[in-house]
């Protein structure tokens, strides 16, 4: 499972820099992003969360099944209405609600919303609703997907980090400091 987020870093220019307790982890201010998202940010996010290399899929699938202690790797289902391999994006309810309607669900990705209050009946969109992190593990065991990305918000990041389920973090450096009231 990977995570996508933005952070400010003093190590500008370093590749593969360490993401640690000293990394600024501001995510929001008064219910919105504290910085203006530009088209490059959105293109990068889309590129990362939609990229699929089908030639590496079998190896990834094998590693996942081994990690999840599954006996068989053949007992997976395709997502309805999806003919091609896609990534999974997992977000909290607030994050889902912040996405403009014209972009819902995020295209070319399997959208999963983590919420204790929402129900599948509340949605016209083709999305999965889960109530807890453990439900995602069960769902992922049934889906045919390439990678899984956690895309926020702060509570969702915290839950996955605390359970040590995030293997890799993709983050964008910000060259300024912003006032934030939501962190992870």
Residue locations for each model-derived region?
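Enzymes that bind and transform nitrogen-containing heteroaromatic metabolites
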Residues: 1-184
